[in-house]
């Protein structure tokens, strides 16, 4: 546990609460002291939803510490069951309340013996000291799915496959980066291919429908952070294949579609080789044949040329102005890796550093971005990211809300491509990052993130209606250095898009030569030293 004023991935209980509050008619009870109960406020502020956050805090106070938590926790479970009538109640401690080392599973068992209802009660099986928000969310989703699958098995539920080819989408949940928009785009893409959606979990799903997950023919995991454990469990239990390629960018989306085609061919081949000629198998083979009759490559070509504008835009003169420009990418493993490939392969932008805060997925991330960037950074420390950006001085940053703050401080534009984000990245309008419509959004974001230069320079030359002075914008930050009036005037004549870099180079030269007062002559000397 460490004290920090900024964390990329939150504590484990946030992941559990995000999964629980994504399902319909599921209530979460958080066993926590005051100060850990900020999830309700955070979700109500950020997520654009009409419903209240279904989370109740069972506060650990001095009375609880004096006589134990069992009575209070059990009372909260039974009370919420009567008030909300949920299908499932999820109990979770926080890293703080875990210090008490209480037997919460015993509390759950006690509540189950006292209450008389249909609601299930589940203790989130998460180690709050060893995992972060994403790992806990992944584990909690898998635990809930496993619970209801095992329950269906005991009831001898029929897990036979759907007549029509269908897929589950796993890992779309509340407070995700553009998750709702991405889900809509994925549904559109699958509909175009003739594939039905079986279940989408956890966002908007019912836990009572989790028993239907094995009826689909394959699973889709659009984000590595959440959903992989569930997909692996379903594969081991029901031999369900899954696709974990994120369809972000033209190349990755094409690869995603080709993987679906390959998967359907493999399923059809397995059925044709099987000696079992049931009516269902024949029906499935016919459905698969209809889908495979479509020219997948033709679909990819048409979507890339006519639906996605990014392909031709990347070859236009506007985008060619960005060729060779330097950029830094940082975010979660899924979005940072995909964005690195898009910038490098599709837009010709040089990625000087690509990084992620998902340390648990570091090996996969390195494998994905190796060869597409100059440096790789794996860290949860925002100060290291800020130092790296300051050292490399890129033309643009693509990162989280924290990199946006760093960019403002260093006067470097930043496009937000990954959680954690603030409310402006929970748009009401349709803004997916996945699929072919997502390529248009990404192309706009990339192009608009770079400072074009001449616009700012011309505004400074001609001023327009702006009567503000320019000089106060370029005051030095280091109190040990002082600029002469002539040097400041010369600095103001330098175009805005390179002025910051020139200023930093001059100050660095002055510090190296122990010159506390920067004159016009020192500026010219610094210029000669840099050019040399």
Swiss-Prot record:
The EC designation for this entry is 1.3.7.7
Q: Which reaction does it catalyse?
A: chlorophyllide a + oxidized 2[4Fe-4S]-[ferredoxin] + 2 ADP + 2 phosphate = protochlorophyllide a + reduced 2[4Fe-4S]-[ferredoxin] + 2 ATP + 2 H2O
SUPFAM superfamilies per record: Helical backbone' metal receptor
Q: Where along this sequence does the record place binding of substrate?
A: 453-454
An example of a Gene Ontology cellular component annotation for this protein is: chloroplast
* Pfam families per UniProt: Oxidored_nitro (PF00148), PCP_red (PF08369)
Q: Which residues form the signal peptide?
A: none
Query: What's its top-level EC category?
Result: oxidoreductase
- UniProt-recorded Gene Ontology molecular function terms: 4 iron, 4 sulfur cluster binding; ATP binding; metal ion binding; oxidoreductase activity, acting on iron-sulfur proteins as donors; oxidoreductase activity, acting on the CH-CH group of donors, iron-sulfur protein as acceptor
According to its UniProt record, which residues of this chain constitute the active site?
A: 318
The free-text function statement in the UniProt record for this protein reads: Component of the dark-operative protochlorophyllide reductase (DPOR) that uses Mg-ATP and reduced ferredoxin to reduce ring D of protochlorophyllide (Pchlide) to form chlorophyllide a (Chlide). This reaction is light-independent. The NB-protein (ChlN-ChlB) is the catalytic component of the complex.
Q: Which family does it belong to?
A: Belongs to the ChlB/BchB/BchZ family.
Q: What is this protein called?
A: Light-independent protochlorophyllide reductase subunit B
Origin organism is Tetradesmus obliquus (Green alga)
Could you read off the lineage of the organism from its UniProt record? Eukaryota, Viridiplantae, Chlorophyta, core chlorophytes, Chlorophyceae
């Amino acid at each position: 546990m460490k004290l920090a004023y900024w964390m990329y991935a939150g504590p484990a209980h946030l992941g559990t609460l995000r999964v629980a509050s994504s399902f319909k008619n599921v209530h979460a009870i958080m066993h926590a002291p005051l100060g850990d109960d900020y999830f309700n406020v955070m979700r109500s502020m950020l997520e654009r939803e009409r419903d209240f956050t279904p989370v109740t805090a069972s506060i650990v106070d001095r009375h609880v510490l004096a006589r134990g938590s069992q009575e209070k926790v059990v009372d909260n479970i039974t009370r919420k069951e009567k008030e909300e009538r949920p299908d499932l109640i999820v109990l979770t401690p926080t890293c703080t309340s875990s210090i008490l080392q209480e037997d919460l599973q015993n509390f759950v068992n006690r509540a189950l013996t006292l209450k008389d209802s249909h609601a299930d009660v589940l203790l989130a099986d998460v180690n709050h000291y060893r995992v972060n928000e994403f790992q806990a969310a992944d584990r909690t989703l898998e635990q809930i799915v496993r619970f209801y699958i095992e329950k269906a098995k005991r009831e001898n539920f029929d897990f036979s496959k759907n007549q029509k080819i269908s897929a589950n989408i796993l890992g779309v949940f509340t407070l995700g980066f553009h998750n709702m928009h991405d889900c809509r785009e994925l549904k559109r893409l699958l509909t175009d291919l003739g594939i039905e959606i079986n279940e989408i979990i956890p966002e908007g799903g019912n836990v009572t429908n989790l028993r239907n997950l094995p009826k689909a023919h394959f699973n889709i995991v659009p984000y590595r952070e959440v959903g992989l454990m569930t997909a692996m469990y379903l594969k081991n239990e029901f031999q369900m294949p899954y696709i974990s390629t994120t369809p972000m960018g033209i190349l990755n989306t094409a690869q995603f579609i080709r993987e679906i085609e390959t998967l359907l061919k493999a399923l059809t081949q397995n059925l044709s080789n099987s000696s079992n000629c049931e009516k269902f198998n024949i029906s499935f083979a016919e459905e698969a044949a209809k889908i495979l009759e479509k020219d997948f490559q033709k679909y990819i070509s048409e979507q890339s040329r006519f639906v996605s504008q990014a392909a031709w835009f990347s070859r236009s003169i506007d985008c060619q102005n960005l060729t060779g420009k330097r950029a830094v990418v940082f975010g979660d493993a899924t979005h940072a890796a995909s964005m690195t490939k898009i910038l490098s392969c599709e837009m010709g932008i040089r990625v000087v550093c690509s990084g992620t805060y998902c340390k648990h997925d570091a090996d996969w991330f390195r494998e994905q971005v190796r060869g597409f960037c100059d440096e790789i950074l794996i860290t949860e420390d925002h100060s290291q990211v800020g130092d790296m950006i300051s050292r490399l001085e890129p033309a643009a940053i693509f990162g989280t809300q924290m990199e946006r703050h760093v960019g403002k401080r260093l006067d470097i534009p930043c496009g937000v491509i990954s959680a954690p984000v603030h409310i402006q990245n929970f748009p009401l309008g349709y803004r997916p990052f996945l699929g072919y419509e997502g390529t248009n959004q990404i192309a706009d974001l990339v192009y608009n993130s770079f400072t074009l230069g001449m616009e700012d320079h011309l505004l400074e030359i001609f001023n327009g209606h702006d009567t503000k002075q320019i000089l106060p914008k370029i005051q030095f930050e280091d109190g040990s250095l002082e600029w002469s009036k002539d040097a400041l005037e010369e600095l103001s004549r330098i175009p805005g898009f390179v002025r910051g870099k020139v200023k930093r180079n001059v100050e660095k030269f002055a510090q190296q030569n122990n010159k506390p007062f920067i004159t016009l002559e020192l500026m010219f000397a610094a210029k000669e030293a840099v050019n040399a």
